[in-house]
From Swiss-Prot:
SUPFAM superfamilies: Eukaryotic type KH-domain (KH-domain type I), Nucleic acid-binding proteins, Ribonuclease PH domain 2-like, Ribosomal protein S5 domain 2-like. This is Polyribonucleotide nucleotidyltransferase. The keyword NAD does not apply. Belongs to the polyribonucleotide nucleotidyltransferase family. Pfam families: KH_1, RNase_PH, RNase_PH_C. Its cofactor is Mg(2+). Its main location: cytoplasm. GO terms for biological process: mRNA catabolic process. It is an enzyme of class 2 (transferase). It comes from Onion yellows phytoplasma (strain OY-M). Keywords: Cytoplasm, Magnesium, Metal-binding, Nucleotidyltransferase, RNA-binding, Transferase.
Amino acid sequence: MLKKVFETTNLKDSFQVEIGTYARNVDASILVRYQDTVVLTTTVFSRKPNNLDFLPLTVIYQEKLYAAGKIPGSFLRREGRSNDHEILTSRLIDRSLRPLFPDYFQQEVQVINTVLSLDPDFKSELASMLGSSLSLLISEIPFFEAISGVYVGKINDKFIINPTLQQLANSTLHLMVAGTKHNVTMIEAHANEVSEQDFLEAINFAHQYIKKLCLFQENIKQQFAPAKITNTLHQTEQTQQQAFFAKHQSQVKQAILSCNSKNDLQQLKEQILDQAKQTPFFKTIDTATVFDYEAHKKHLQTTETLFQKLSKQETRSLILQEKIRPDKRGLEEIRTLESQIDLLPRAHGSALFTRGQTQSLAAVTLGCLSESKIIDGLSDEQNKRFMLHYNFPPFSVGAVGRYTAPSRREIGHGTLAEKAISQVLPEEKDFPYTIRVVSEILESNGSSSQATVCASSLALMASGVPLKKAVAGMSVGLVFDQATNKYVILSDIQGLEDHVGDMDLKIAGTNKGITALQMDLKIQGIHFKILQEAFLQAKKGRLHILEHMSQTISQPRLEVSKYAPKVCMMQIKPEKIRDIIGSGGKIINQIIESHDGVKIDIEQDGRVFVMHSNLETVKKTVAFIESLIQEIQIGTCYQASILRFLSDKQGKMIGAVAQVCPGIEGLIHVNQKKFQKITDVLKIGETVSVKCTKINDRGRIDFLLLPKNTQEKNS
């Protein structure tokens, strides 16, 4: 393929696309330049057909540290497993692309985005999304319509397309939108209690820019005109599907309408598969008739796939035509809510939130700021003091499964809940703790990420974290008939509705506005009118859940748990930091040892955080540090400890060195008239009262020994 270069025009940002130069053994390769950000996207698909009921699409986003001129900090000094940002970006691109693939295409596809150079103000995520879409467009893969993504910020009531890092820091809205030139396909956002109307306006604003990027890609596609893979479903397979549907339609419908539709559908599927196993398959090999294992296996796979299609068709039909949900709820009805706090006595805060058959147990741990998470990627190193971890064990869905490292899904769900809560957390100066929340999903039947939001909010308030407001979340679903444009919006979708539906819109927020949002589609875009209705329906449900939560706990507790560490922050002059640390950490280690292992964190700006489980120990440590950094003054009296005696080179006694506190020492001179022999009057380790009489130009201090009954000013 000859090298071809294309560049956007009449856009805020300039994208340059190079095709035909790099990685030429793949089905499609794109090098995207976005100012100094460079991303290589490669796409490969398997020619081997699969008998699956889903698309085995894998999207990988990987950052090479040389892209930012950095050497990896790991022991091996090379990139290792994907970090959270890489995983989340991979999911972001996957969720944007997946709705655009036709149902008939089920061959394995792998799209890899490698960041080769990074300018932090020009996001590699956008370049990766453009490269992923374009590589699919110019390949044989049946991907027919371009998608693009943009970021939107909001500063001083004005929307900004693809804001810089500095602009994002001042923005009340962090919105990522992906879509085609016709519709939106994916939304991801977190915000500072932004209203539904502002969100909708921002999405519409983003889509105007998306259209231009999609047209840019389609113009490139026309120059390549790739031959696309077509539908290979044969007439015999269509006939087989029709016969299966006719035979089992009434049984499936009855199972869906039962009181326990999930279990009844599973039992019916197993019953039908058992019947399919009885079907004999034989083949002839060298005049001998033998059992055809491969044909038998394919028959079972086909039967299971057809059952899934039929149950999906019948569930959708009931919702669309008869407005009947599998569990008989109304379209806007929320499942039964239950919540309680303080389940775990030794955790610093805990809560259990149950919505129908979905249940989250959240536990809060408070720690010192030095326990915050260090994020070291392509951008500058950052400290993250709030973490929310989501665990989805196999028993939550009644299954046997492997326990491994957190999956991409678990990381994604945890991050969404983390974004929702982080908007209402107190500032570090007001609550100087590292906060970790863990959500254990004990039961799951849809919307477990939003149950996590609710449980986490309750647990944080119970732990004494002064949240600005309570946060709740809920998922809204959609069933859309593309032939008739009929649709039904469902509040608080359960697992079956999520599986057969066309949208999963998760919205979390307070009673004032939205703090986090995520939308995934299974159809090729959603009309703006439907999106508007879904937002309003989600708000109604969220307010209902917040009202329920307020009956369990309405305000954050005024104090942290008795098992949580107590912390005090003090501000000192940065030049005084060395007085606390001492040479080689000598002084700070002495403080820690003499104060029951107290934790002390010192920031470069002079903030000192003292933490211990006992409040009195914290107060004593703070008082001691204050004495360390005090400016010694002439004429002021102090308590001092005798450290040693000094003699001159001839061995003649000069005086005694007294220490007010580590780092502040002075001389009690032998010439003071009261001394006959200083060693008879003073003993090493003895505490005496002294008065500062002189500080010379070199900072050396002279003390006057006071009578024992003198009341010192400072102790």
